A protein has these predicted regions:
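N-terminal cap/lid segment of alpha/beta-hydrolase-fold proteins
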Residues: 1-27
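Alpha/beta-hydrolase fold active-site loops
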Residues: 30-34
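Divalent metal-coordination and catalytic microenvironments
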Residues: 46
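Gly/Ala-rich beta-loop-alpha elbow adjacent to hydrolase catalytic centers
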Residues: 111-114
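Active-site glycine-rich loops that stabilize anionic/oxyanionic intermediates
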Residues: 35-41
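Secondary-structure boundary motif
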Residues: 26, 55, 103-107
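Alpha/beta-hydrolase active-site loop
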Residues: 82-109
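Conserved alpha/beta-hydrolase
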Residues: 50-76
């Protein structure tokens, strides 16, 4: 049985917080997969996929990008990353979650956008 661990960590944008989860398999970790959701999505949408993969030995992690899911502070934040260089903030936040998640083994990034 896999275990979900919810986490928060500071965004690379000052004053902002990222919310995410890690789904840890029972037993040996065969691989690590970091999920990156698409625009106007949220990471909790992928919990069933994470559980499916974790039940097969894959540690899965992911977070809500700024302006998405539980990382939204106000309705004005909806779909908004940051100014200036919001795209760089998203990449830096992805990297921060990667560093937080690194363990021995294989790691892959699964990105999705419709």
């Amino acid at each position: 049985m896999s275990q979900f661990i919810d986490f928060t960590l500071p965004s690379t944008v000052p004053g902002r917080t990222l919310h995410g989860f890690r789904c840890v398999p029972e037993g040996q970790v065969r691989a690590v997969l970091q999920l990156s959701h698409g625009m106007v999505e949220y990471i909790d949408r992928y919990r069933p996929l994470a559980e499916y993969l974790a039940d097969r030995g894959i540690l899965v992690t992911g977070h809500d990008h700024l302006g998405h899911g539980a990382s939204i502070r106000t309705k004005e934040d909806y779909g908004y990353f940051a100014e200036p260089d919001g795209n760089r903030a998203v990449l830096a936040d992805l990297h921060a979650v990667t560093v937080l998640t690194i363990i021995e083994g294989n790691a892959e990034l699964l990105a999705e956008d419709e």
